[in-house]
């Protein structure tokens, strides 16, 4: 039997009805023809940004990571574990998929500690207990997990969703796909790079070809590949017809090698 698969959703996917329709149609097709257990992990930067804008709150980033002051963590939790998570559950319901909404702290699935005081309520994710999610998977549910976590001291933390997905993949012994707006990592000429090693990534970062949020994504994928001891795919949701093959292990974007 294949390992479970974690599909991490990112970019504007949550903001686009067309993207969600393509994704959930592909999930329905895949679940009808394959037995592989699936888990969705999501962030929702665009949902948070819209909310912050509406509330006239500043968005600060440091090295591609969102700074989360104490007076903003409740708002961000509401956006990610509330709006973003329940939007995905609503799409699952619309497509007759039995889904369960979770956050990283449920069942202690992912352990979270504070990453850096300067970043505020931003968490570092580490593997936790697989019991709850395995139980849901065994009963045919699709877990949909937001990237909000909680420390042992009971502090809510905003966790980078790529890193949250990596920690959960390590917890479950699962494979990982990072789905976003881009078809993979592009070279300086806009061409997709099929495979990427750490050395190649460092070279492209030095050359300024991989920048900003993509640095965080590539580093998260490299970290994931090292942690999991197997390749991690960065791919796009745009080609819905290719998604079932991607979910089954066919490389469609950039395959990150440990």
From Swiss-Prot:
Positions annotated to bind ATP: 181-186, 209-211
Gene3D superfamilies, per database record: Acetylglutamate kinase-like
Catalytic activity: N-acetyl-L-glutamate + ATP = N-acetyl-L-glutamyl 5-phosphate + ADP
Enzyme Commission number(s) from the entry: 2.7.2.8
Pathway recorded for this protein: Amino-acid biosynthesis; L-arginine biosynthesis; N(2)-acetyl-L-ornithine from L-glutamate: step 2/4
InterPro entries: AceGlu_kinase-like_sf, AcgluKinase_fam, ArgB, Asp/Glu/Uridylate_kinase, NAGK-NC
Molecular function GO terms recorded: acetylglutamate kinase activity; ATP binding
Pfam families: AA_kinase (PF00696)
The UniProt record lists the keyword Kinase: yes
GO terms, biological process: arginine biosynthetic process via ornithine; L-arginine biosynthetic process
Site, as annotated: Transition state stabilizer: 8, 217
Keyword ATP-binding set for record: yes
Keywords of this entry: Amino-acid biosynthesis, Arginine biosynthesis, ATP-binding, Cytoplasm, Kinase, Nucleotide-binding, Transferase
Residues making up the signal peptide according to the UniProt record: none
Gene Ontology CC: one annotated term: cytoplasm
CDD domains in the cross-refs: AAK_NAGK-NC (cd04249)
Binding site for substrate: 44-45, 66, 158
Recorded family membership: Belongs to the acetylglutamate kinase family. ArgB subfamily.
Subunit structure: Homodimer.
Protein name: Acetylglutamate kinase
Gene from which this protein is expressed: argB
